[in-house]
Amino acid sequence: MPKEHKKRGRREDQKKRKRDHDDESASKRSRKEDVDHVQAENPLQHVANHVPRQDAAPFYGMLDEQEQEYFKKADEMLELNQFESPEDRRIFLASVCKEAEGKELKMATSQTSRLLERLILLASEDQLKSLFQTFSGHFLNLVQNRFASHCCETLFIKAASAVSQENASIKTEALNTPPASDPDEIIVSMENLFLYTLGELEGNIGFLMTEKYASHVLRVLLVILSGEPLEKQAKSVTQSKKKEKVTVSGAGDERILEKRVVPQSFLEALEKVISDSVSGIEPHYLRSLAIHPLGGPTLQLLLKLELSHFGKSRAKDEKSIIHRLLPDNPIAEGTESAILINGLVYDSVGSHLLETIIEHAPGKLFKQIYGEFFKERMGSLARNEIAGYVVGRILERLGKDDLEEAMRQIVDQIPSLVERNRTAPIKTLIERCVAREVDCSPIKAQLETAYAGPHGFEVTRILKLNEDDGKPRARHGESNEKVHGSLLAQTMMTVDGPLGQLVFDSLANLSPELSIQLARDGTASRTLQAALVSRNATVIFRRKMIQQFYGKIGELALDPKASHVVDAIWYGTVGLAFIRERIAEELAENENSLRESQVGRKVWKNWQMDLYKRRRNDWVAQARTTAGNEVFQSFPDESQSDAAAPARNHRTSRHMSAIELARQKFAAAKAAQAKDGKKPKKGSNRTNGSSETPKSLVAQ
């Protein structure tokens, strides 16, 4: 009897379906429990729940497959920018813009938003206004969308400059791409379009401050309203570090905004946003917002704009952000304000808010906070990885007497700071001591001991170089340590005295192999570049340092990192014309390899090697003029102005070598002979290669 036909593996399928069902149920339970747990722990959820907003974002439709493929190819072509002529590019852009008409919302909420960003960067003022009107009524949903939020951010930044131009009555020239025309369209100013957008977001600011995507757009909008420049650092408070940078050839760097004059309506709107953002939040929820990963940076920006644009007297206003954060007067231990400050010091997010308070707070409030919480703790706080940056902000506001006291505390911790590779407080301390004219000798003594090696102070220990394997050490977190070490060494060299001389002497005593390694290291080479162009570097140091690279200039000029050192040698050969010619000869010997390399071509251009090859005499004359007259001046006489002498000899007045001292003594004897009436014979030459004092120097 034939058996019933059954599918093979049915038992496994049943088991798999059962496992999947159990996993899904467990996952749902787990997610629900996680949400409940977060809601219980995060008091900010209470604030968000009281903000009226739509439960589900509207659906704007999807592009069909042909449209998606077309826009994808258009995006690739704009990115590559391989058009045969500008006219072809203009025609292509016109066709893309025409195809995108009426589909802007679909594009903004899908992966084709990258193409829309590029089109915004290339858009004219009329096209920007048209897109503003298309997005009008949808901004609250768009700023919360993963893709559309980037389009809104780009649109705001691009349109911000147009506001200033409109107010200055400057008519901008339209781009080649014609805008979409509608006979029923009502043209409004860019200023009003921004204000309409704010009107859409009004009442939702508290929620948007902590929204994953909208919080970044909100910060950009606040900066635009204030007229402040838009920061573009990696850790800028206005932008996520994960944001992809979308660019397009021909648009320039339109994402950078300089400081601008904004209309009064913008400042009034900004003041209202600052007031509304915290008006409905209880004080304990506001303090929780200070340590929120998304709300914290927004609160920092609001506080900074409040104190910098509307006067530090607002600290007395009970409705201001600073007063609501720190309501107690005086701020004493045990108060709510004291609890907040002590909690922010060691928090990775909250410490940034505390830095903002310290930087922008009124003088009376700062002195109160410093005296109560930090004056006796500067040394211990400097050792902490997070609190060390707060210490740096405090040092920037201290007077000379308080700075000397803080220096004594921090100097005792320098060995511990060096051991932990936390050199940022030391760098800031040196900078402030120089600015306040505080003696740096205690810092020099501690650093000399902390970075001591078999041959005394070793700059390679600051720069984290390993002489044995010829490569930088590979270990976790070394990148930041190397950057901070390089910055510390560069700061030390700005000090005219024993502290800076530690670095110069150590660099001059490096072996040729280690000097080459230093030049090839991307981070450490910046210290070498700074040393070669430093005003405190003596002629002897620069000569000894540059001679370490003889025979290797061609190789270094081809290295992406070391090529910058070769460029710095041009400025480092001031007063060393013969060394400059020696380096140029070595570059000329490697002409073929340099011309074949993009890096090498830049070095060739910076050293003016085409002039060297074609008209060598002109190059030599120019090199000797720029490299010789800066330091090796003609001997002074009575015809030269006494006031001009220090300016002409600013290098020789510092760390004078034996030969320079001898020249100075000879010049003094020469001046004494002139006073006695003894003149040199006519035609005699007592100067370095010139028969008379240059007229330009006398004129000075």
Curated annotation (Swiss-Prot):
Family: Belongs to the NOP9 family.
Swiss-Prot/TrEMBL Pumilio repeat ranges: 200-239, 336-371, 372-412, 509-547
Predominant cellular place of this UniProt entry's protein: nucleus
Descriptive protein name: Nucleolar protein 9
Matching InterPro entries: ARM-like, ARM-type_fold, NOP9, Pumilio_RNA-bd_rpt
Positions with biased composition (Basic and acidic residues): 10-39
GO cellular component, one term: nucleolus
Biological process (GO), any one: ribosomal small subunit export from nucleus
Residue runs in coiled coils: none
